[in-house]
């Protein structure tokens, strides 16, 4: 499924309006400080698992490209296998370790050794399963997913890169790090370079990673039983809850999550338009694609 230009323009207009409102007075600070609840169970759930769609998308993309490696030329097969397996293993580890890392985010001793071992074991299971599954899928079927794999990889890499560059440049203190309105910085105030992670509030990386779930809409032409609008509603709800959870936990202001989410939407739309969409609104496999 493709996000339409109309959707992009409308969402951009909403973003600008909201950022304009949040730039006035103490609205951004007031809203964020009002809903903060550092002990919220549901917010902690999305704090732990909100970024999984991005890491799993990275695993999905690298696994598909690994399955499409050139097996006829030995040196290419060996080289691409090493590169592919390395990134598959890394993605598998991130999927399993990130939720555990956030459990002990503020622990003085960090992640206990037992949990580190557990994450490695789980990562090994995910990694081996990925290798087995991709080797059972035909080359013809994998070729259908090649451009989707490229979009996933570029989307995750680009949104993480853009977000982290902005974080360092902006140097905005997190909600949990300030004690009064006097220490508050508006979203448009550039105070970088960031001295530490506590000054990397703008924009929200969690939210950007959470909205990567929208990219799974590219698989909808292959799963006819899933209603497109229902999936998009679910994806936007997931991204929205990830965003809200970051504000509730005091990790971000409302303006941080708005920009973080839109970065992913914009990058996804651009990549989707370049790699997937054609004049007839068909996918790269020739299957008709629906637009929302």
Language-model-detected regions and their locations in the chain:
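Hydrophobic, lipid-facing residues on alpha-helical transmembrane segments of integral membrane proteins
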Residues: 57, 87-91, 125, 153-165, ...
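N-terminal transmembrane-helix/juxtamembrane module of multi-pass inner/ER membrane proteins
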Residues: 2-123, 170, 174-175, 180, ...
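Membrane-interface loop-to-helix entry segments
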Residues: 42-57, 107-125, 194-222, 254, ...
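Membrane-interfacial, low-structure loops and terminal tails that flank and connect transmembrane helices
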Residues: 1-4, 75-79, 136-147, 282-292
